[in-house]
Structure formats: structure tokens, C-alpha cells
């Protein structure tokens, strides 16, 4: 298949992008270097429109090819406040911050898709590339939406994915309906008599 052959050709370069992003992780809404990296790559690929600073540090790129559906592809960019213990050439250079959830990979995959789609234009319509900040519990998607993401760049459908270590290389896992749950917070207050954990019968 032509697409697999092209990505095989790009593999080494794409791997370099991922390692660069992994070595320079940034926390929620602080993805300034990452956003600049993304925007520069999109410009290099010949993406038709590039919009920065959406919802803080979000980036949107648009690839056009005639009339047709508008399809959104989304990836997250932020890292976590974790000290990396790995020993590798691309270990985090930002002390106390690490790409422990694979968003460096997500960003890289969407950049790879952007390059391929911009090169080939083998579709009709528009592809909206959405690089989201602050996925890790800080409502980066909401920030982009509140900043007019879908008013400015409406889509007919939108797709995202999450890496899943343990899957065989070259395979993907899919299923009907939502596949990832969102987290929420709540507080509950209990009034009653307390006791020691070793003597719960006294409570």
C-alpha cells in the first residue's frame, strides 16, 4: 500500500520529532515550545492555514482539497509533573516534567498525518488538525471550544486516538461507541461516629 510505503520512508524523521518532543515536555497550558514546533512543521509541510494561540497554546492547521466533508483530527500535547527515571538519549531535559502518557507520540502521529495528507491531497474536503493543550485534567478542549474552535473551524466529524502500550506493532484497537472515559471530581460529606480502622465495629 502506498500509504504504508510512504510512512516507512518517513519513519526515521518522524521518530526524531517524537524524541525531540519527549526530551522537551511541557505542562498544561505551558506548551509554548511544543506549539511552536508544531506550527513550524505544519508550515514546512505546506498546510494551507495555521492558527496559533487557540485556547491558550492550542494550534489548528487546515489542509484543503476542494469540496467535501470537514474532518477533524485531534491530538493532545501536554506532559505530566513526573520525574523521568529512564536512561535514554531523549530523556526529559525539563526536570520534574515527563511525557509519561504518550502525548509526544500523539502529537507526532498527527504531524505525520499532516505531512502525508498535505503531500498527497488524496481526499475531497478539508482536514482540520487540532493540537490540544492541557488534556491532563485541566479542560484544554473546553478552553479551545470556548475560544471559538468549532465556530471558526466547524467539522462534520472528529477523530482522536490514544496510544496503548502492549498492542502488537502495526495494529490498532477499535470498537463501537466511546472508548475513553472522562474523569470528574466531587465531594461528599459524611456525618457520624468515627473509630480506629482496627475497630470499625465501634463506629
Residue ranges, per PLM feature:
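Acidic/His- and Gly-rich active-site-bordering loop/insert found
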Residues: 1-99, 108, 115-123
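Histidine/acidic-residue-rich, glycine-tolerant segments that coordinate divalent metal ions
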Residues: 59, 80-82, 87-98, 105, ...
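Residue-level detector of alpha-helical segments with a strong bias toward transmembrane helices
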Residues: 112-113, 202
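Short, well-ordered amphipathic alpha-helices
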Residues: 113-114, 145
